Amino acid sequence: MSELKLDPYFGEYGGMYVPQILMPALKQLETAFVEAQQDPEFLTEFHDLLKNYAGRPTALTLTRNLSPNPKVKIYLKREDLLHGGAHKTNQVLGQALLAKRMGKKEIIAETGAGQHGVATALACALLGLKCKVYMGAKDVARQSPNVFRMRLMGAEVIPVTSGSATLKDACNEAMRDWSGSYDRAHYLLGTAAGPHPFPTIVREFQRMIGAETKAQMLEKEGRLPDAVIACVGGGSNAIGMFADFIDEPSVKLIGVEPAGKGIDTPMHGAPLKHGKTGIFFGMKAPLMQDAHGQIEESYSISAGLDFPSVGPQHAYLNATGRATYESATDDEALEAFQLLARSEGIIPALESAHALAYALRLAKDATEEQIIVVNLSGRGDKDIFTVSDILDGKASA
């Protein structure tokens, strides 16, 4: 570990729990990242892409009708307005540029609902990189519009039939491919989890979310918000929002995990509050496990939060008490999804609706004037059929 330039741990969490064959690839990636962060040319190109291709800075919108309490202002950080429809475009552009700088010709990625796959495909099309996306066969069947989008942009989508044929199996196949091809390929991981240096790279390529929010807040209100709230699956949109506020003790950092059918049922995805520390996906982190230490399937109405572990920096922020992690059920997220659409004319991603649901709960109970910022991490186009089917089912029940 002495050869590393950055600390691979956040407290006891993180690390590089990978086969020896991948250590040179991770060390090479860390070196390239550190050098790129000090290279004005790289940073200029990254910021130019964010501004002129992706559409940054994104708006900070004060909701007009959403808040249930006149004392509480609810602002939305509008990552849903970003090209590609979600926060994922930020760090994908950063990693793809980094891969190009390293001389890689090919990108390997995994995807569940297809959002990360679509973001990766658009970055590869833009930068002239070959793109291979591993996707569980079940997800390929469920997410045909995103599969078509990826293929339309030139990506090769590879259905994975092993195991449960879902995201974790796609991750395994992508990692296996990378272990034999890292001389020419970069594995573009989709969240702030996995082995070092991925959690740090993803945070740094997402931190403009919080940096912009801070500047916009000071301009609009002349002060910082009382709380910033974001949903947490692997944790990339949340760490992007939190990073610039960690050293601002007056600002509460609140992450919202998916409570699914209820925290007291096996049908949830809240490892931070209800998991045990273990080794998974190349890192030491809280993990949903059964009594025998086997990984339990996570569950959420939103595919993007359906992850049995969480990024190591979130585990550390939780352990130290700097951030608080709450949860919202499927039903609460569905209610918030519909409420935002009806009250503000904005359809959020189901993932973001979890953060919104908790913000509404917090606002309702407030007795003093407060300003809350919710990271609206993505738009809800991808979720309209899921929500429509659920609401139709409830109506006919």
UniProtKB/Swiss-Prot annotation:
Its Gene Ontology cellular component terms are: cytoplasm
EC main group = lyase
Q: Which Pfam families match?
A: PALP
Residues modified as N6-(pyridoxal phosphate)lysine are: K88
Cofactors that this protein relies on: pyridoxal 5'-phosphate
Q: Could you tell me which HAMAP family the record lists for this protein?
A: Trp_synth_beta
What is the protein name stated in its UniProt record? Tryptophan synthase beta chain
Species, as recorded: Shewanella amazonensis (strain ATCC BAA-1098 / SB2B)
